[in-house]
């Protein structure tokens, strides 16, 4: 069985999110989420304060990815920012990692304790032939 790994895109969240920086960020990100099942890691290392604008930006990214059956994970999130995400009630929507590398690697872990992905019909036929 051949399993192709889709690319993981890492995008750096700006230090301060304003209406203008949010529009630019989402415009830049659009080319990466317009794929089937986009896999995004948002690098939060520059985020000093997890305010409402930043949380809104994260949620917009998640919404765009989920429209295409993708996922967004957060990397390099500071402890105070994690606390703010929990307080705002959105921490359960994201997998949060201490580093960008850990967040990226989490996409590469096979099955990660969940049900394996469905096999393509051709692969299912091959599996059935091997059993018979």
Stretches found by the model and what they are:
Residues 1-13, 17, 24, 131:
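Short beta-strand/loop segment at the start of cytosolic alpha/beta domains
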Residues 17-94:
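Amphipathic alpha-helical interaction surfaces in cytosolic regulatory modules
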């Amino acid at each position: 069985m051949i399993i192709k790994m889709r690319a993981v895109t890492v995008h750096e969240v700006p230090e301060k999110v304003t209406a203008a920086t949010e529009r630019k960020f989402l415009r830049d990100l659009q080319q990466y989420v317009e794929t089937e099942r986009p896999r995004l890691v948002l690098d939060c290392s520059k985020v000093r304060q997890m305010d409402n604008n930043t949380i809104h930006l994260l949620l917009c990214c998640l919404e765009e990815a989920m429209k295409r059956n993708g996922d967004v994970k957060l990397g390099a999130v500071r402890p105070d920012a994690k606390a703010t995400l929990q307080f705002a009630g959105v921490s359960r929507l994201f997998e949060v990692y201490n580093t960008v590398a850990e967040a990226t690697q989490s996409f590469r872990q096979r099955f990660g304790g969940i049900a394996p992905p469905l096999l393509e019909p051709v692969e299912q036929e091959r599996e059935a032939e091997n059993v018979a």
